[in-house]
């Protein structure tokens, strides 16, 4: 209850302190609103999506943003891409095709040993969480993993298998822009701050190497005490249905179009002279196709059933869209009010520090902060500040923002850190001490891998 009053009180104090200087009204309002939002996001006296409406109400009210600028923030193409991505993921889950992909990958990598079984589940979890939420991935794989544990006589298998699914779901989400909300927050704020855009394929060129390094390291660490023998029989799957095949075809074409829209070679949007094409448009065309293409079944009225219906589509997490829109709104407020320039000027001395040290510090702070706070709320708060700090230090904002976005997916220590951690911990198959012991090492590994990868891959930006 205290946090309910702490938010507006802290905002008022911040406003009074900052507004004493001439011309500081707009920056003071922006900082006050941001502080209020942050406190309510962290302590959640009201739901996080409801808190996300504060910038929408207060920044235009006090003249920091115009209604048109506010609409542009919430109608940003990346907000629309997130909307389309959520609906596509819903169709994939509704069809059941994701379960078949998971079982296929587990069988392909699982082999005939307990250790390889864990790696198989981790590969499936990481791949699926690139395209659907890590929560859905974990919930889908958990029953299969529990069934495998019932048939295993290896007493050391439970915690590595369940932790592997949770950790891989978080790591895999780094791989694509739609894999986890912090990636989209970065892309939205970066676009707003710099006027440039990061394409789907460009993000993957940076992120996939991190996934490919982190995943085997995590697997080797958590399976160090697991037997190399003792295969487990997995549930048999039936033949693919027509609907599953069609959903997978639509999804595969969509992913291919996302990855090839822009790139070093030009991309199809340039070849076809479509300068206004973006990833959100691709997603919406795919969504429309899912509503049109029949699934091969009939509904209760004898009519052809489609691959997607509105009852399924409307169950997407709408609150995430509000949270994302709030982040872009705050970033726009930072720019319009001049607060971004003020922060950048105050942090100019950062340019004297080694780049690797700055990035590692950001990664360390974000990793451990997201152990106790929402990763999307954390990145939404930090992205405008990091962008201003990078500009003040004379570097490209992406050099500070990308490591933060990736690190927000590397909280492995506590059950409350991510939904996959909570879901697997709730099975009661391992203790919180086990998660902390395994997770703290991977947290530090994540800091090291992301810091080095970003310096090597982004250092010439």
Q: How would you label these PLM feature ranges?
A:
Residues 156, 204-209, 322-335, 340, ...:
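C-terminal transmembrane helix pair
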Residues 70, 97-109, 141, 145-148, ...:
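Hydrophobic alpha-helical segments of integral membrane proteins
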Residues 25-31, 75-79, 107-121, 151-163, ...:
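Membrane-interfacial loop-to-helix junctions in multi-pass transporters
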Residues 106-174, 181-194, 375-406:
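Hydrophobic transmembrane alpha-helices that form the pore/transport pathway of multi-pass ion
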Residues 36, 52-56, 73, 81-82, ...:
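Alpha-helical transmembrane segments of multi-pass membrane proteins, especially transporters
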Residues 147, 151-248, 422-454:
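Membrane-core helix-loop-helix motifs of multi-pass transport proteins
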Residues 5-7, 84-93, 109-116, 121-137, ...:
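Helix-loop-helix module between adjacent transmembrane segments
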Residues 1-81, 202-345, 363, 442-447, ...:
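Hydrophobic transmembrane alpha-helices of multi-pass small-molecule transporters
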């Amino acid at each position: 209850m205290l946090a309910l009053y702490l938010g507006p009180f802290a905002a008022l104090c911040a406003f009074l302190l900052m507004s004493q200087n001439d011309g500081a009204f707009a920056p003071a309002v922006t900082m006050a609103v941001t502080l209020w939002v942050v406190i309510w996001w962290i302590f959640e006296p009201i739901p996080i999506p409801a808190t996300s409406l504060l910038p929408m109400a207060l920044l235009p009210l006090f003249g920091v943003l115009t209604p048109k600028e506010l609409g542009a923030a919430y109608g940003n193409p990346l907000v629309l891409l997130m909307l389309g991505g959520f609906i596509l993921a819903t169709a994939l889950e509704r069809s059941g095709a994701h379960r078949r992909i998971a079982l296929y990958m587990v069988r392909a990598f699982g082999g005939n040993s307990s250790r390889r079984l864990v790696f198989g589940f981790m590969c499936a979890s990481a791949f699926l969480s690139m395209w659907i939420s890590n929560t859905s991935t974990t919930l889908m794989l958990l029953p299969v993993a529990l069934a495998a544990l019932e048939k295993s006589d290896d007493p050391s298998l439970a915690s590595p298998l369940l932790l592997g699914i949770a950790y891989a779901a978080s790591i895999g989400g780094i791989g694509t822009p739609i894999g986890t909300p912090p990636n989209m927050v970065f892309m939205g704020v970066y676009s707003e701050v710099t006027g440039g855009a990061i394409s789907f394929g460009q993000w993957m060129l940076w992120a996939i190497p991190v996934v490919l390094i982190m995943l085997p390291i995590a697997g080797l660490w958590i399976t160090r005490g697991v037997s190399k023998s003792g295969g487990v029989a997995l549930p048999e799957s039936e033949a693919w249905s027509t609907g599953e095949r069609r959903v997978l075809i639509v999804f595969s074409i969509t992913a291919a179009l996302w990855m090839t829209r822009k790139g070093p070679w030009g991309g199809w949007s340039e070849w076809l002279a479509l300068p206004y094409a973006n990833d959100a448009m691709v997603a919406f065309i795919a969504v429309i196709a899912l509503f049109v293409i029949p699934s091969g079944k009939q509904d209760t009225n004898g009519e052809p059933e489609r691959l997607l219906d509105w009852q399924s589509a409307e169950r997407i997490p709408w609150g995430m869209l509000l949270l994302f829109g709030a982040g872009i709104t705050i970033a726009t407020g930072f720019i319009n009010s001049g607060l971004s320039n003020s922060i950048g000027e105050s942090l100019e001395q950062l340019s004297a520090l080694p780049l690797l040290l700055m990035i590692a510090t950001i990664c360390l702070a974000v990793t451990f902060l997201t152990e106790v706070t929402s990763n999307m709320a954390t990145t939404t708060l930090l992205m405008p500040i990091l962008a201003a700090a990078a500009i003040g230090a004379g570097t490209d904002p992406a050099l500070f923002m990308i490591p933060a976005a990736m690190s927000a997916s590397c909280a492995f220590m506590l059950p409350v850190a991510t939904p996959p951690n909570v879901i697997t911990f709730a099975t009661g198959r391992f203790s919180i001490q086990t998660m902390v012991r395994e997770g703290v090492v991977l947290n530090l590994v994540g800091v090291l891998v992301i810091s080095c990868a970003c310096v090597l891959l982004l250092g010439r930006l």
